[in-house]
Amino acid sequence: MSTILLPKTQHLVVFQEVIRSGSIGSAAKELGLTQPAVSKIINDIEDYFGVELVVRKNTGVTLTPAGQLLLSRSESITREMKNMVNEISGMSSEAVVEVSFGFPSLIGFTFMSGMINKFKEVFPKAQVSMYEAQLSSFLPAIRDGRLDFAIGTLSAEMKLQDLHVEPLFESEFVLVASKSRTCTGTTTLESLKNEQWVLPQTNMGYYSELLTTLQRNGISIENIVKTDSVVTIYNLVLNADFLTVIPCDMTSPFGSNQFITIPVEETLPVAQYAAVWSKNYRIKKAASVLVELAKEYSSYNGCRRRQLIEVG
């Protein structure tokens, strides 16, 4: 059987750095190599494939279609190589474990501290990177291996066939306002159509479904501000009299009593939370432990559903 000579992994790393840096000169500085050495590596890769991968200009480099394909595939290859090195190194008790994951604000306000404390008991030297946002923001990073997994809300329009989905819990969401607002009894969404609203920025998941509900009740998109910042949401509600819809476990952030829930006649959607990770990469042991801890702490806290508090 003939042996196929494959490109060197280090050459792929150099190619990726050239694209990331935007020029051969900048990449050479980052890599600690000479500019001629980097140029030769790029030339060698192009000779190997027999096509031009980058267009060299005075202002830097741009990718050709073949270069775009190589960049995408090579990033997957080098990430898998890194995961393999970490996994094999992890067999040693002295190894440094790395894990990165995404999570929604609800997790940060509820069981994140307990989950991470427990994880650190198992992996005391682990390097943990956590990112807070909606699940839709994490999907590209999950698919290409930059994130080990993410927790978030699911919705019917999400295409998750290439991902493992581990259901965790359900949560009721409630309409929240500043305590300074005068409210009596139950109201309707339609009666609030002229109010200003603030919601998390996302194009799928729970808030996408909620947006449909709000618009169906006459609330215009022009009256809805979107942001990735939970702090900004609380600030606009507290100091600018905006309305928002958040999980029932987030109505008293850090013990604050500055917010109230407003009962509405309409039924707000219930959020389904799950952990998701790519089927194309074997999940790391450390990431798997975190997912199991998320399941464990979710069960401790029930399904996060509680009755609305009447305002009046």
UniProtKB/Swiss-Prot annotation:
An annotated GO cellular component: cytosol
UniProt xrefs under CDD domains = PBP2_TdcA
| Location of the HTH lysR-type domain | 7-64
Which pathway, per its entry?
Answer: Amino-acid degradation; L-threonine degradation via propanoate pathway [regulation]
For this UniProt entry, the molecular function terms from Gene Ontology, in alphabetical order, are: cis-regulatory region sequence-specific DNA binding; DNA-binding transcription factor activity; sequence-specific DNA binding
User: Which Pfam families does the annotation name?
Assistant: HTH_1, LysR_substrate
Q: What is this protein called?
A: HTH-type transcriptional regulator TdcA
User: What species was this sequence derived from?
Assistant: Escherichia coli (strain K12)
